[in-house]
Swiss-Prot record:
Keywords: Phosphoprotein, Ribonucleoprotein, Ribosomal protein. Residues 96-106 have a biased composition (Acidic residues). P1 and P2 exist as dimers at the large ribosomal subunit. The lineage of its organism: Eukaryota, Sar, Alveolata, Apicomplexa, Aconoidasida. Gene3D superfamilies: 1.10.10.1410. This is Large ribosomal subunit protein P2. Belongs to the eukaryotic ribosomal protein P1/P2 family.
Length: 112
């Protein structure tokens, strides 16, 4: 199901209509020349009959909180090794930059 149906339905609710019909949602979508699949829209409207939009949003947020991020904490030892390696690489890069600067100034300066 496309989010356009959800958005149009919620726009109707925000406009003061707690239970918008298929026709009203079609009018909202028609205002922006969106394609409407009648079967999908009818199924969506039927699934929301008798339900409050605010309750659905609250229930959905609770479900999202239970899902979690799916990211596990990295071991602290691995992070320390990575930072030490990064510091070594930074020092090498700094030395290379200093050498390049010294090579650039070989007395061939036009203005100094």
């Amino acid at each position: 199901m496309a989010m356009k149906y959800v958005a149009a339905y919620l726009m109707c609710v925000l406009g003061g209509n707690e239970n918008p019909s298929t026709k009203e949602v079609k009018n909202v979508l028609g205002a922006v020349n969106a394609d409407v699949e009648d079967e999908v829209l009818n199924n969506f409207i039927d699934s929301l009959k008798g339900k409050s939009c605010h309750e659905l949003i609250t229930d959905g947020l609770k479900k999202l909180q239970n899902i979690g991020g799916g990211v596990a904490a990295a071991p602290a030892g691995a992070a320390a090794v990575e930072t030490a390696e990064a510091k070594k690489e930074d020092k090498k890069e700094e030395k290379k930059e200093e050498e390049e600067e010294e090579e650039d100034d070989l007395g061939f300066s036009l203005f100094g």
